[in-house]
A protein has these predicted regions:
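Structural recognition of the beta-strand scaffold that forms the well-ordered cores
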Residues: 77-80, 115-119, 141-144, 188-192, ...
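Accessory recognition modules or surfaces
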Residues: 135-141, 169, 225-227, 234-247, ...
Length: 288
C-alpha cells in the first residue's frame, strides 16, 4: 500500500531520453515478445535477448533508486500498479476479500497500455494463474514488491517491520513465488512496501542486483472511492518521464479501474506515450 513518498536522497544515473523508447500503446515495444515464422535457412541461428536495463549502484555500492526519467520532449509516462497482499492476509482472502483486479488488467489490455506491475510474492501465491497471465502478456512486466509486504524501515504506515537480516531473503522469496506461479521473466526492479527505505535497507539489498523503483506522481487511489479525483490528481502531476504509482487490488483501490478510463485517453490526447519502467530506465542511462 502506497500513501505518500518517503525516501532518502539517492543517486540515479540519468541520460538523454530519445530514440531508445519504442512506440507505446501497443505490444510492439522493444521488450515485447515477437514470435513469427522462421524462413528456411541453411545455417542455424540462435536468438539472444539483452538483460533488462538497471542503474549502476549508488554511493558505497548501495542499491540504486529510480524515480523518473529525464524531463525531455519525448512525453513518456509509465503507469505502475502495486499488487499488494501482506503475508498475514490469507484469512481475509479466504473470507472473500479480493486483492486482485482482473477488470483493471482487462482495461489496460483493451486500451493497449503497457504497464509495470509490482507484485508481492504472497499475491502470486494467492493468484498464481493471474500472475502467470500478467507475466506472459507482452504489454506488461512484473517487478518485485517483496514477498510479505512488511516494511523495510521503522514507522512505515503501520506495516509490520522486517529485520535487516531478512530483507534480501524476503525479496528472493518473492522471485521464487513468481517462478512457482509460472512467471519466467520477472524484472530486476524492486518497490519497497509503503515506499519506505533508508540507508540500512538499501545496503541490505545491494547484493541482490535490483534497482529500487519509486515514483514522482502519487495517484492517491489507495482506499479512494472517487474515480474522478484520482484521475485529476494523476493528470495534474504527470510530466514527461513520470512514474505513476497506482494499485490493482479491488478491496484497497476500488476506484482505480474507472479512473484509468479517464486518465488513458486524456494523456494520449495531450501527446503522452505509455511505456514500461524498463524503457524509462533504459532511456535514463540504464545498463544492460
Amino acid at each position: 500500500m502506497i500513501l505518500s513518498v518517503r525516501s532518502i536522497a539517492a543517486t540515479c544515473a540519468v541520460g538523454a531520453l530519445g530514440a531508445a523508447l519504442a512506440a507505446c500503446g501497443s505490444p510492439a515495444s522493444p521488450d515485447a515478445a515477437h514470435r513469427g515464422h522462421r524462413a528456411p535457412a541453411t545455417t542455424a541461428t540462435i536468438a539472444t535477448t539483452s538483460p533488462p536495463p538497471t542503474l549502476a549502484p549508488g554511493p558505497a555500492g548501495l542499491t540504486p533508486v529510480f524515480k523518473n526519467a529525464p524531463r525531455t520532449r519525448a512525453k513518456t509516462v509509465a503507469l505502475t500498479f502495486d499488487a499488494d497482499m501482506t503475508a498475514d492476509q490469507g484469512a481475509r482472502a479466504a473470507a472473500g476479500e479480493h486483492f486482485d483486479n482482473p477488470q483493471l488488467i482487462a482495461t489496460l489490455q483493451k486500451f493497449k497500455v503497457p504497464a509495470t506491475v509490482f507484485m508481492t510474492g504472497r499475491w502470486a501465491d494467492e493468484y498464481p494463474r493471474e500472475a502467470k497471465d500478467i507475466g506472459q502478456d507482452p504489454l506488461f512486466e512484473i517487478g518485485n514488491h517483496s514477498y510479505s509486504h512488511y516494511a523495510f524501515t521503522d514507522d512505515c504506515y503501520g506495516l509490520p517491520t522486517m529485520s535487516e537480516d531478512r530483507m534480501r531473503a524476503d525479496v528472493e522469496r518473492a522471485y521464487a513465488a513468481f517462478r512457482q506461479a509460472g512467471v519466467r521473466d520477472a524484472m530486476p526492479y524492486f518497490r519497497f512496501p509503503g515506499g519506505c527505505y533508508d540507508q540500512r535497507s538499501l545496503r541490505a539489498l545491494s547484493a541482490s542486483g535490483v534497482t529500487a523503483v519509486q515514483w514522482d506522481v502519487v495517484s492517491g487511489d489507495a482506499f479512494a472511492t472517487d474515480a474522478d479525483a484520482v484521475a485529476q490528481q494523476v493528470l495534474d502531476g504527470v510530466r514527461s518521464g513520470s512514474v505513476v504509482v497506482m494499485h490493482c487490488t479491488r478491496s484497497a483501490a476500488p476506484a482505480t479501474e474507472q479512473a484509468l478510463r479517464t486518465i488513458i485517453p486524456e494523456l494520449r490526447h495531450r501527446g503522452f506515450r505509455f511505456v514500461k519502467v524498463s524503457q524509462l530506465i533504459a532511456a535514463a542511462g540504464g545498463r544492460h
